[in-house]
Swiss-Prot record:
The chain crosses the membrane at residues 41-61. This is Uncharacterized protein 140L. It is found in: Membrane. Keywords: Membrane, Transmembrane, Transmembrane helix. GO terms for cellular component: membrane. It comes from Invertebrate iridescent virus 6 (IIV-6). It is a single-pass membrane protein. Its main location: membrane.
Length: 64
């Protein structure tokens, strides 16, 4: 597993996250309102969601 394989999807994912941060937070808090008292669980869910976005964006970009 090489970081260069994921570099483009990481860049796209970070840009996507910068533009969608507010609605992403609202989506997670709206789905799991009890997470407001558990920032580490919220952060882990957010990172997991970002990883899924990277994977999906990478799959969409690299369709052959």
């Amino acid at each position: 597993m090489n970081i260069n394989d994921y570099k483009d999807s990481i860049i796209v994912g970070v840009l996507f996250l910068l533009f969608t941060r507010d609605w992403f937070d609202e989506l997670i808090f709206g789905t799991f309102p009890s997470l407001k008292g558990m920032p580490w669980v919220f952060l882990a869910l957010k990172v997991l969601g970002i990883m899924v976005l990277f994977y999906l964006l990478d799959a969409i970009i690299n369709v052959k």
